[in-house]
Amino acid sequence: MASLLWGGDAGAAESERLNSHFSNLSQPRKNLWGIKSTAVRNIDGSINNINEDDEEDVVDLAANSLLNKLIHQSLVESSHRVEVLQKDPSSPLYSVKTFEELRLKEELLKGIYAMGFNRPSKIQEMALPMMLAHPPQNLIAQSQSGTGKTAAFVLAMLSRVNALELFPQCLCLAPTYELALQTGRVVEQMGKFCVDVQVMYAIRGNRIPRGTDITKQIIIGTPGTVLDWCFKLKLIDLTKIRVFVLDEADVMIDTQGFSDHSIRIQRALPSECQMLLFSATFEDSVWHFAERIIPDPNVIKLRKEELTLNNIRQYYVLCEHRKDKYQALCNIYGSITIGQAIIFCQTRRNAKWLTVEMIQDGHQVSLLSGELTVEQRASIIQRFRDGKEKVLITTNVCARGIDVKQVTIVVNFDLPVKQGEEPDYETYLHRIGRTGRFGKKGLAFNMIEVDELPSLMKIQDHFNSSIKQLNAEDMDEIEKIDY
């Protein structure tokens, strides 16, 4: 497959800049150890002063989506059960266990194996027969990062392309240009043996003059730019599109204007165009959007994985102030055998202060918070997974999706609360759910002040689980903790 293509010299410069952007992923993180000041050094060497950042980190759906793509570079084992709803319940339901069963072109099969795929993932087993069917079938699918979702729809696009026809035939919408580039990388890898198939980006910075004859068969872009290319610049003839993919639908509808742009594009597509929509979550708003944009679909859902607290022992420690919390943490840390730990703080200020304290006491610690770029976060998480640091201190940017088998302890240095001091039950669940995974037992400690006790009791009642008080000054009591 030809390299990913841009328009003209400006496009080449943009491509070079983006190659540099992604090469940062392999750069090692600067060492945090030995810091003796009230500042924390970022991954890029810049300094954050702990007198700043009282605000809580706001979870950015698009950034989280990109982060999950970067940290799930290979397939992950999913505990979800796949549920299929066919548009025609009487038709046979096919699944595959090998890629050979799909009767793919030889160059596509070679591309799949070159990417390291040995057999289809759970969602690929069910989705690929539908996506590659003749005549084409529309699909709405729920899928998390690491399940092979992007590879599945890229395979569908590459399978439908006629390399001899030099015009756009497949169109993929992504909510951000970074996510579009990630999809493009998969196209390039899987299509490396499809020498006459090319891809082009409809994203900001790639300016194409009106009336340009685009000969690339696959277009990947963001809704606003694609809309301009189709209706304003007349670069893409939507009546010739054979496959339309809308990726990250839950992120798309969270971005103002994108859902309207996507619907306008979809309405100009021919009735025989295959339409595929993917989303990590299927809340009501996503469902309503999906039903508006994908006609007569098959549906693949992941039966909801219930995070359980049954194998997590929960404790709380009453503290008077921040330093008291830190002393309690040190006592626990010195009395219990810990694999790896994640400590959650509500604000960047507390996260940075705690990082400095632990580093000065000789602990191997990394700090993860919202001011870091997505690539920097991915690098820190990978180092933590590799065991290069034993403690990860973070804000809510790490409350979901980070699965590390060695994590045995989660600490809420600050209790998660919503505005108005109401307990944030969902965040609490996902925070302490970082331990006790993969069938193992785990521990969760909540460092609270007296006025937070009513909120903690609400959490206990909400989950109908036991949260026991722990005297962190009684080392014998701590040592008796069994998990």
Swiss-Prot record:
In the Enzyme Commission scheme, what number(s) does this protein have?
Answer: 3.6.4.13
**Motif Nuclear localization signal mapped to chain:** 100-114
**Record's subcellular location:** Cytoplasm; Nucleus
Q: Which residues form the Helicase ATP-binding domain?
A: 130-300
Role according to the record:
ATP-dependent RNA helicase. Required for mRNA export and translation regulation during spermatid development.
- PTM statement from Swiss-Prot or TrEMBL: Phosphorylated on threonine residues. The phosphorylated form is found in the cytoplasm but not in the nucleus.
Q: Source taxonomy lineage?
A: Eukaryota, Metazoa, Chordata, Craniata, Vertebrata
Q: Which GO terms describe its cellular component?
A: chromatoid body; cytoplasm; cytoplasmic stress granule; nucleus
Short motif (DEAD box): ranges = 247-250
Give yes or no: UniProt keyword RNA-binding: yes
Chain sites annotated for binding ATP = S143, Q144, S145, G146, T147, G148, K149, T150
Keywords of this entry: ATP-binding, Cytoplasm, Developmental protein, Differentiation, Helicase, Hydrolase, mRNA transport, Nucleotide-binding, Nucleus, Phosphoprotein, RNA-binding, Spermatogenesis, Translation regulation, Transport
Tell me, which GO biological process terms does this entry list? mRNA export from nucleus; poly(A)+ mRNA export from nucleus; regulation of translation; spermatid development
Q: Which family does it belong to?
A: Belongs to the DEAD box helicase family.
Give the organism the record lists.
Homo sapiens (Human)
- Name the reaction it catalyses: ATP + H2O = ADP + phosphate + H(+)
UniProt note on tissues of expression? Highly expressed in the Leydig and germ cells of the testis and weakly expressed in the pituitary and hypothalamus.
Tell me where in this chain the Helicase C-terminal domain is found. 311-478
- What's the protein called, per UniProt? ATP-dependent RNA helicase DDX25
What are the inducing conditions? Up-regulated at transcriptional level by chorionic gonadotropin via cyclic AMP-induced androgen formation in the Leydig cell.
* Motif Nuclear export signal location, chain numbering: 61-74
Q: Where is this motif: Q motif?
A: 97-125
* Gene symbol of the encoding locus: DDX25
The terms under GO molecular function for this entry are: ATP binding; ATP hydrolysis activity; mRNA binding; RNA helicase activity
Source species, domain of life: Eukaryota
Does the keyword Zinc feature in the UniProt annotation? no
